[in-house]
From Swiss-Prot:
Interacts with CSRP3. This is Probable D-lactate dehydrogenase, mitochondrial. Residues 62-242 form the FAD-binding PCMH-type domain. SUPFAM superfamilies: FAD-binding/transporter-associated domain-like (SSF56176), FAD-linked oxidases, C-terminal domain (SSF55103). Readily detected in liver and kidney, with a weaker signal observed in heart, skeletal muscle, stomach, brain, and lung. It comes from Mus musculus. It comes from the Eukaryota. Residues 1-52 form a transit peptide. GO terms for molecular function: D-lactate dehydrogenase (cytochrome) activity; D-lactate dehydrogenase activity; FAD binding. The lineage of its organism: Eukaryota, Metazoa, Chordata, Craniata, Vertebrata. Its main location: mitochondrion.
Amino acid sequence: MAMLLRVATQRLSPWRSFCSRGSQGGLSQDFVEALKAVVGSPHVSTASAVREQHGHDESMHRCQPPDAVVWPQNVDQVSRVASLCYNQGVPIIPFGTGTGVEGGVCAVQGGVCINLTHMDQITELNTEDFSVVVEPGVTRKALNTHLRDSGLWFPVDPGADASLCGMAATGASGTNAVRYGTMRDNVINLEVVLPDGRLLHTAGRGRHYRKSAAGYNLTGLFVGSEGTLGIITSTTLRLHPAPEATVAATCAFPSVQAAVDSTVQILQAAVPVARIEFLDDVMMDACNRHSKLNCPVAPTLFLEFHGSQQTLAEQLQRTEAITQDNGGSHFSWAKEAEKRNELWAARHNAWYAALALSPGSKAYSTDVCVPISRLPEILVETKEEIKASKLTGAIVGHVGDGNFHCILLVDPDDAEEQRRVKAFAENLGRRALALGGTCTGEHGIGLGKRQLLQEEVGPVGVETMRQLKNTLDPRGLMNPGKVL
């Protein structure tokens, strides 16, 4: 063990061909003891149940557990664990809250899962500069609770109460993206432990400026890297003023086409909508049952507006007129916080509502994003393909920026149905690419969309990504098997 600890302090050492792995494929006892010496015995586990828990996310991808799970308490421990793994050729899998849906935490080659949830401090708040620095265990809800009396908030809202550093790692988005942008637009700086244990501050240590023309955009490189380039141990985020007033609304439509046409026209009219979400008839039926709503079972838009009382009245008037021109009905306002929260809770619980439609089934979720002008076309075609494939599925999405999700229900014991679901997801990704879009707007590539990534960015794009990966992670130890 002493030798392993000495090696962990070195920056470069000969490739050891997984010499720390025992003869049965797990980690050697000496290596496990070395991990305990870094983070403490209570913060290392090789128990089967713990490893299984950390070997999967919310996806249906066939996943493998790591060989060990560690809970570092600070960035120095993360650096030392990474260095130890790097020098011993052991794969590293960062873990936040495990709410991803593309198999991003699956340990395809075993290795060490670094659970970052014990690092849960908000280390700096700069209200005058509209920025905050958080550790990887801080979730979106925890941050906004902390900000409640500051007049500021962090709006990126993927639904699940994900960790903010995990959201940065996956390039997450959410219901507010149409107004406030995605994680790519709201991350100012990152602290990253590189695979060999070195510490990188992507915009410079302690910097939280709004813009810079200094060199390459290293922050942008790591946002959306899905744990394949390094371990994000801190993120500096852009905050926004909390809105003076908020109003939500719902409106039902006679068809998918009418609902999406309204979306496009609302955006073209420059209505500064904060959220505009589409739910198809299947999803509305599920939400009515699961969340005790009383909405028409029809294609529906959920909307939210932020601003002053005066501007909100104007926004609602213009939006209602547009929806009526497209056959919209049952236009309902929700001004009280309790009613708004009920509405958005139903939207965020769409995954569980869909699952309740078919007890015993598993849910498979996939997402794409297309230019707004092609959104009506792809949504109508996707709805038709779900029916043609004889699958049970719902469509829900952040249509204000062209992004939507399909939640498909699958019998886990029906191999043929699983094959049809996989074929549907691949067809949807290729349909989005054919329309000038992307195979994923916010879920990421993970395990399931690596082939589609190659089709999206082309051979030169993939090779450039591979060269970047090889430069930062020459031993291929950071979350192997993902993205590339």
